[in-house]
Amino acid sequence: MLKFYQMKYIFQILDKMRCLRKRSTVSFLGVLVVFLLFMNLYIEDSYVLEGDKQLIRETSTHQLNSERYVHTFKDLSNFSGTINVTYRYLAATPLQRKRYLTIGLSSVKRKKGNYLLDTIKSIFEQSSYEELKEISVVVHLADFNSSWRDAMVQDITQKFAHHIIAGRLMVIHAPEEYYPVLDGLKRNYNDPEDRVRFRSKQNVDYAFLLNFCANTSDYYVMLEDDVRCSRNFLTAIKKVIASLEGTYWVTLEFSKLGYIGKLYHSHDLPRLAHFLLMFYQEMPCDWLLTHFRGLLAQKNVIRFKPSLFQHMGYYSSYKGTENKLKDDDFEEESFDIPDNPPASFYTNMNVFENYEASKAYSSVDEYFWGKSPSMGDTFVIVFENPITIKKIKVNTGTEDRQNDILQHGALDVGEKLIFSKQIRQCDTYLRLGEFKNGYFEMSDVNQKIPFDIHCMRICVTKTQKEWLIIRSISIWTS
């Protein structure tokens, strides 16, 4: 039998535990949610045996439902499913078929300036008739001010009626009732309350936009509502995607500013929407996108140059403050991505760390780096199949290492392939020309060379003290 003082002591302990439980509930739920998110991202990618998957799903569903944390989190046990939101169609016709690419824009009322119409105009004007058949543009008017939304819908329908009728342009709105709490949020990074509210709502705006676009196309690119596009950007994107066939990627970046020009597989959009919604109050959208990429095991940024999209807004959507950010890698005219057919690479230069030969051939922003090359050193590209080349361009050195260029070199092409124990190589070569200031370019190669090319070789014709960076090798075929 327990004595009175023992009972009193037990009740004191229980009371302390209740207080501790109250104080730790929020932090515990935060850890729980992160864990469940990771486990769902993990199991959706088929890394776990089916029996373990089912156990994890049942556990995660039970925990989330039992806590009833907030209404936003109720359905998050299935990250591959869309969020249950009833959208308002402000201007749209039914999408008759799935497109290749959806371009997503989210827009709110600005205190100064309005760039949305110019952004939509740029998307359509910079696309050819054939490209227009493969794109859809979804605009989320995310402001809760209905008068502003009505005015914007009127402007959009007047200027782009034919695109709406053709099913290329849809204007939607996610009602305020679906939004989580936006006031009284924690002030991470010591941001002022209005800034926290702005960026938190922006995360939810994009989450609902991504959720809507999950089944409209094969790929999705995220833009802001104050962006100018490069001419024929869709053709450039398709070329890049084709060049990465067989390569795992989560995010491709076609701009270096914020979340402009981030490209995703559409099948990843539900998970990304859930992710933004779950952590909406934690940090800005572009930071969350970086974490999402890492969670899905894409370690490095895959960014392409030149950029396809340029920020053009002068006044920010936050308080109308000045925003002069520009992408200095942007090019207005056609982004002529090289074909760079499949090939193998060989060099007898002393390679620095992991800057291997193949990196000079990639359209990603990386390069080959070799230590002080000697006369007679070579960098050889052997194509899987003989090709007809229209144009060749080779850049050496970088902006911050302008001395690491090929000071004395030449470029050769070969026809007949031979095999040895070490490498595949061509037995005879024809010299196309010399490098000038570390640069080589030649057009109409197919009119000057009477054979299909199986090998291409960069030769060092004089020893140099400086190291050598081959920044890019670009080949266009006919």
UniProtKB/Swiss-Prot annotation:
Q: Provide GO CC annotations from the record.
A: Golgi membrane
Q: Which GO terms describe its molecular function?
A: alpha-1,3-mannosylglycoprotein 4-beta-N-acetylglucosaminyltransferase activity; metal ion binding
Q: How does it sit in the membrane?
A: Single-pass type II membrane protein
Enzyme Commission identifier(s) = 2.4.1.145
Q: Which coenzyme or cofactor does it need?
A: a divalent metal cation
UniProt KW Thylakoid keyword? no
Q: Which domain of life is it from?
A: Eukaryota
Pathway listed: Protein modification; protein glycosylation
User: What does it do?
Assistant: Glycosyltransferase that participates in the transfer of N-acetylglucosamine (GlcNAc) to the core mannose residues of N-linked glycans. Catalyzes the formation of the GlcNAcbeta1-4 branch on the GlcNAcbeta1-2Manalpha1-3 arm of the core structure of N-linked glycans. Essential for the production of tri- and tetra-antennary N-linked sugar chains. Does not catalyze the transfer of GlcNAc to the Manalpha1-6 arm to form GlcNAcBeta1-4Manalpha1-6 linkage ('GnT-VI' activity).
Q: Which family does it belong to?
A: Belongs to the glycosyltransferase 54 family.
Q: What is this protein called?
A: Alpha-1,3-mannosyl-glycoprotein 4-beta-N-acetylglucosaminyltransferase C
User: Organism classification, top ranks?
Assistant: Eukaryota, Metazoa, Chordata, Craniata, Vertebrata
